[in-house]
Amino acid sequence: NQAWSIDITYIPIRHGFLYLTAVIDWYSRCIVGWEVDDTLDTRMVINALKKAFAVSKPQILNSDQGCQFTSQQYVDFVKENGIRQSMDGKSRWADNIMIERWFRSFKYEEAYLTLYNNIKEARSAIGRYVHTYNFERCHSALDYKTPAECYYPAMLLPYVA
């Protein structure tokens, strides 16, 4: 919970696109919050953060310089939750590499292989993918543990002492 990244990507569906906001913990690579909507706006981003904040909050929240992340509503929401906002340099996608890499995996392993008919179908599939990713997929960078195995025990460390 030291640093998280947040970003938005497009998801193709039968009649257009949906937008997926995802939040990832840098240490564990756990997806700690997400939201999908057919409208690209700040409300969707804040809803993803509210889901993540229901479990915990980071010290730092990194994003790109997209209009949702520079909006006064977003800036105020992050500040009100006691979180330091961090932003990538202009056109520096690698600054947010954790979430960009997760989006790549999600798209090539799920979204590009399935043509969703509607938002309900997409939301269900995304939920299954996130669950599998967090709780079943082992990562070599995590000593072959799942993101959830690294994230949830790490949350308890300040309370153990």
Question: Which residues are covered by each model-predicted region?
Answer:
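Charged DNA-binding/catalytic regions of mobile-element recombinases
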Residues: 1-161
